[in-house]
Amino acid sequence: MYAVIRTGGKQYKVSEGDFLKVEKLEGAVGDTVELKDVLMVGGETVAIGTPLVPSASVVGRIVDQGKDKKILVFKSKRRKNFRKMYGHRQPRTVLKIEKINA
């Protein structure tokens, strides 16, 4: 069984037992998170939502809270000797998908 969920403005295809790196979710390591934005559930039969599948949810456990790799941004203007480099590390959460409720 698999599901397509929406979190952090992105869509992910998940199955039970998968590890998923998503935008930061509130909660401590070990907490359970229920994601209710389920767009599609598949298996023997496929249920496609309009836009969400009613009464479907995905349960996951927070494995890690941390930061992603550094993203470098470089700006320059030609012929003006203007160069600027900066970056940031986006906060992220790692989830382990435990159960898909369809």
UniProtKB/Swiss-Prot annotation:
BP GO annotations: translation
Write the record's keywords in alphabetical order, separated by commas: Ribonucleoprotein, Ribosomal protein, RNA-binding, rRNA-binding
InterPro entries, per database record: bL21-like, bL21-like_sf, Ribosomal_bL21, Ribosomal_bL21_CS
Q: Give any Pfam family that matches.
A: Ribosomal_L21p
Keyword check for Signal, yes or no.
no
Query: Which Gene Ontology terms of cellular component type are present?
Result: cytoplasm; ribonucleoprotein complex; ribosome
Listed GO MF terms:
rRNA binding; structural constituent of ribosome
Signal sequence, renumbered to the chain: none
Oligomer and partners: Part of the 50S ribosomal subunit. Contacts protein L20.
Question: NCBIfam families attached here?
Answer: L21
Spell out the family assignment given in the record's similarity comment: Belongs to the bacterial ribosomal protein bL21 family.
So what does this one do? This protein binds to 23S rRNA in the presence of protein L20.
Tell me the protein's name.
Answer: Large ribosomal subunit protein bL21
| Protein's organism | Geobacter sulfurreducens (strain ATCC 51573 / DSM 12127 / PCA)
